[in-house]
């Protein structure tokens, strides 16, 4: 859950967001982006770093943490085909860090083949994976008398939130 957008932010808030479950003392230098608590983003990760506003060095202030969160988020704003989350998140797919997929209303993620899932949550994913679907996820339809394809294939644990109107 993102930190507040304004007002007071405490060191305990930082620890709760970026070191969940920890009761250890806080060293502010651990909270630089690309430090030990706020992971770097791999070059082949197509998602948005939810803590991109946090500096990697130099002066750091609690206000740098406004509206930041622990994790990477990829938002579908246009239709897409044959999506594999290991490709979306690149080398960060195997990193123990939260990952979020958002499919906006009116957007369709679909398959072009009955042998390929529209959205593949491939094996090897680490950290929590949450998919919030306000659009559509469709497998490829089969030919007459034949089976259709898979819409969502989960080989790694994930949470799917289907919002009202989603398919």
Where are these regions (language model features)?
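Glycine-biased low-complexity/repetitive sequence motifs
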Residues: 2-167
């Amino acid at each position: 859950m993102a930190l507040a957008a304004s007002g007071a932010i405490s060191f305990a808030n930082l620890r709760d967001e970026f070191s969940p479950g920890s009761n250890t003392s806080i060293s502010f230098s651990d909270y630089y982006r690309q430090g030990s608590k706020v992971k770097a983003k791999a070059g082949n990760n197509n998602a948005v770093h939810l803590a991109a506003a946090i500096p990697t060095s130099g002066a750091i202030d609690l206000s740098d943490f406004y509206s930041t969160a622990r994790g990477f988020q990829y938002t579908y704003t246009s239709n897409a085909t044959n999506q594999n989350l290991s490709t979306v998140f690149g080398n960060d797919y195997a990193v123990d860090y939260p990952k979020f997929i958002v499919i906006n209303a009116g957007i369709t993620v679909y398959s072009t083949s009955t042998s390929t899932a529209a959205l593949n949550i491939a094996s090897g994913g680490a950290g929590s994976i949450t998919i919030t679907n306000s659009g559509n996820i469709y497998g490829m339809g089969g030919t007459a008398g034949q089976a259709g394809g898979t819409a969502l294939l989960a080989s790694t644990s994930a949470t799917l939130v289907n919002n009202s109107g989603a398919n």
